[in-house]
Amino acid sequence: RSTGWIPLFAENNQEAYDNMVQAYRIAEHKDVRLPIMICQDGFITSHAVENIELLEDDIVKTFVGEYEPEHYLLKDNEPFAVGPYAVTNYVMEAKRAQMQGLRNAKQVTLDVAKEFEKISGRSYGLFEEYRMEDADYAMVIIGSAAGTGKDTVDMLRKQGVRAGLLKIRLFRPFPAEELSLIHI
């Protein structure tokens, strides 16, 4: 949490690819400017052979856009230092900026996902709801276990159990307020 990284989780290789394309836009957004990690289950998905739909390179390049840094590192008339070390009198300012970027990441993630849907036809949010509309029980899952979880929900539904699934995509900042609005 205190590192300031934004973890985006993927259920499968398609989501890992899609998250990677979106991650550049989220991380480089002027209201975020924080690193993102694309999280996928080691071996379960990382070593799996799975078909995915790739976007054309020119479409991805247009979507991601050119990197436009707020500050260039090598400007002799505007020198500044970059690094993980912060002296005592700067720590609070740095942490405050980091936390503000994390707070902003929720809306930026949703905005980028809407734009991504226009070019890919694939929709993403902060989390995915599966059969939650009338669920009495819900599984909360991250990563590749969601596929098995969805099959389990379907089996439970056939047995008359009103089960559902919530798959977390954006883990930090955690979408607690948004999750609290879901029916269960």
PLM-predicted stretches and their roles:
Residues 36-41, 162-171:
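A generic structural motif
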Residues 182-184:
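Conserved small/polar residues in nucleotide/adenosyl-binding loops
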Residues 1-35, 39-42:
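Conserved thiamine diphosphate
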Residues 35-128:
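Conformationally flexible catalytic loops at phosphate/diphosphate-handling active centers
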Residues 133-161, 174-179:
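Redox- and metal-dependent alpha/beta enzyme cores, enriched for Fe-S-associated oxidoreductases
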Residues 108-124, 141-149, 168-176:
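A general structural motif
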